[in-house]
Amino acid sequence: MRAELAVYFIAGTQDIVRGTLPGVLEEALKAGITCFQYREKGAGSLQTASERKEMALECQQLCAKYQVPFIINDDVALALEIGADGIHVGQNDEEIRQVIASCAGKMKIGLSVHSVSEAEEAERLGAVDYIGVGPIFPTISKADAEPVSGTAILEEIRRAGIKLPIVGIGGINETNSAEVLTAGADGVSVISAITRSDDCYSVIKQLKNPGYPS
């Protein structure tokens, strides 16, 4: 799982400023993302279940073509219906124990955490496959984001002995990703660093190899 978290792209239709979500996703897949999470939330997102399912299936097919895990954010029913590779939930989304009961053994389970205690609880549950930690830096992609924690939270979680794979989230881009990895994350998750880029190939190469020339 750790290798799959290296460059973890998150997006929904609400994040796309040029082109379409499938178009942006395929470019990102060609450039080398290692995981994709379909997150359809907030202003500008698809509103009906049928629209979300249709988009999820199109994105899932693209991920399968490039052999990259396809994860759905906070929609267990849809993830189970289409056979997603994983489900990701936040602290205020579907109750994690219910998610585990429905999904354990069928797909990977990811959980967002914002503190050492939440990370410790995720590890105690025994069925969480990885944790998303943040927001590390200020973000424009999530209106209801938690307070910024900085990279220190990653160091604190690792010092506490948490062994779960960690992906950092929140305001991460090709200029600061090295800090996130140095602090203890196994990978970085990005939204706008890819969706708002004119050259996602270069961005993704730099995210995968922080020393890669820009």
From Swiss-Prot:
Cofactor binding note of this UniProt entry: Binds 1 Mg(2+) ion per subunit.
Alphabetical UniProt keywords: Magnesium, Metal-binding, Thiamine biosynthesis, Transferase
Any one Gene Ontology molecular-function term assigned to this protein's record: thiamine-phosphate diphosphorylase activity
UniProt xrefs under Gene3D superfamilies: Aldolase class I
Top-level class of the enzyme under EC nomenclature: transferase
Chain ranges passing through the membrane: none
Residues binding Mg(2+): D74, D93
Residues the entry annotates as binding 4-amino-2-methyl-5-(diphosphooxymethyl)pyrimidine: Q37, Y38, R39, E40, K41, N73, S112, K142
Sections of the chain in a coiled coil: none
PANTHER family xrefs: THIAMINE-PHOSPHATE PYROPHOSPHORYLASE (PTHR20857), THIAMINE-PHOSPHATE SYNTHASE (PTHR20857:SF15)
Family: Belongs to the thiamine-phosphate synthase family.
Record's protein name: Thiamine-phosphate synthase
Species per Swiss-Prot/TrEMBL record: Listeria monocytogenes serotype 4b (strain CLIP80459)
